[in-house]
Amino acid sequence: MKTYLKTPTSDMTVHEIRTIVKETIKWCQDNLGTKCYGVDYSVRTLGEKYTPAYGMYDYSKRTILVFRNHAPTVKCVVRSVLHEYAHYLQNLRWYNHVLQKVGYDKHPQEVEARVVETMYSICWNDIKNKI
């Protein structure tokens, strides 16, 4: 089956989603840079008691998490990985302090991550033949 940005993740296996995440991270490493330590990733199902999110970056575990039950399309998966990879590159030491002062939508690190997200079509054009 050919995979497109609009392909529903509900039609995909976890392995297929993991491949997209892995290739997106490789693209990020080549095009956005890395840190002295690497980043891991995991594709999971987010429990119902949690606030819905496409993904998150776990700073303490240096892991990008993608929640397949909340990222409905391949486009959402790629955008989520780009967004969370931006957080991996950022210094998050004062993240929570700034979050309390300005909120999520105006947080400078969230604004920056949303800008990185917009690179999804460039990323997808580079990785789609590896999926």
Question: Which role fits each region the language model picked out?
Answer:
Residues 13-37:
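Zn2+-dependent metallopeptidase catalytic core
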Residues 35-38, 95-96, 127:
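Short, polar/charged, Gly/Pro-enriched helix-capping and turn/loop motifs at alpha-helix termini
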Residues 44-75, 92:
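Active-site scaffold of zinc-dependent metalloenzymes
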Residues 75-79, 91-117:
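Post-HEXXH active-site segment of zinc metalloproteases
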Residues 82-90:
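Short active-site segment of divalent metal-dependent hydrolases/proteases
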Residues 121-131:
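Long, well-structured alpha-helical subdomains associated
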